């Protein structure tokens, strides 16, 4: 849990400093605050005498809490190799049990060994994931996930030490007996009454909370649900201006150059919730709430998630999170094994909500560094991201003339399964799909305009009214080049939830590389007849970048927006692509039979900025 700058654990950080603390600062009088330098993502911690660390997933950070800790910051990462050359005598990658790093400035880090040179006996050969470092009872606590292995369930463990560098004394067993649900990603928080709680959980089972014992080594048996299952993991809580902010991550963490992992936020005035997003939708709701906050923005960084937040010595908030580099996604010699370097960016509070760099998203240019030490001042300033402003309408179809003029079919379905009626276009959902080599779904298409544009549709899709579970039945928009190259924004049923999915498929691809990747955006319309509609919008812009070309690059940026009321919009992630003159705008209703999708209108507009 992120806290203020006093002697309390504040978590976070990592990213490569290109120009560290300015040397001129050393010449300033002691009474004058020293300005920090600049840095550029990613962080690449040094290995003394032996290269740099290229992956630091699920980072957790703490400022040293004792005088003997030398005002250093301490960083802990999930079990992974340090880089592609980190191999044993047999040539196998070495998996470190929570690699540990130190820094005086939060940007230049040094590898200091592993928290556990030998894994605890109860962990045996399993991975030790998602460390959580905290301090209370005059000692350090290092919580971690024991990954599933050979039929043993995932569980939460803990070790203690007088020093943030250990040696660590492991409890030797789990904090509580797992029940088969995913018991991942520990996060320790303190409520308004001073009671500590352990947040944990992932997609299978959702995020839950248990009361932590006074000694920090066990929990109560009662659980409080924090988020609905089948959506979030990686909980991180920050207390800011009387509100608890819950940061959580969603989708696939590790899908190489199509990783669309992203971070969302909700807030509550009680630690145990309920947490709601900026639109007032609960993160426990079936039409899952969550305001996008750390999302890919079209530069090289994808998979921006599992973050931690902290406040620096100048009162500026920051976050550290892992990502994937679209140009260099895998460990060397291990195609399919995604590297996750750590990134550092500023959190700017806008109208009571956190934004990353004022809404600009993950940075890939020089940034002002945080104030890591007493007396430092950061030069970071809030610069709000420009908004996508819709211009004149290029064309609009209200589906009220019975003709579908201007549209054509890719694989026309039976004429009894679609049509116009009562001012909507209806289409029965099909037991068909557009997914890798399964390409039998019907797509209603028309040509996309030239230049920058936005397409918006109002969609009704009601599977949750009929209960659970109708997995991956979906309806919505596509930007369609062909069956193997498209962008898709749909309202989709996933187990007991309804979500908005923003996906990309490409082909052909190199051997071992992915063809399909998917992220999620904001909440859908409600799960009742009273509020059934979801608004979907894709904004297309041209943005040339010669460093982002090839199969996973391109000069076109596609950004997703969703709304559950047509007035308040959530801006989601951005995919980069190159569909060119072959791009068409399409409608789909697929993934399973038994439902009817309804489109109230489709409108294409110019985009101004």
Give a label for each model feature.
Residues 2-35:
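Secretory targeting and sorting signals
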Residues 36-68, 83-85, 107-134, 149, ...:
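Surface loop/turn signatures of beta-propeller and other carbohydrate-active proteins
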Residues 57-90, 112-115, 123, 128-152, ...:
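Hydrophobic core segments of beta-strands in well-ordered, beta-rich domains
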Residues 103, 216-217, 256, 267-270, ...:
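Short edge-strand/loop segments of extracellular domains
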Residues 207-270:
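Aromatic-anchored, glycine/proline-accented short structural segments
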Residues 260-350, 530, 539-597:
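Aromatic sugar-binding interfaces of carbohydrate-active proteins
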Residues 354, 360-609:
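Extracellular glycan-recognition regions
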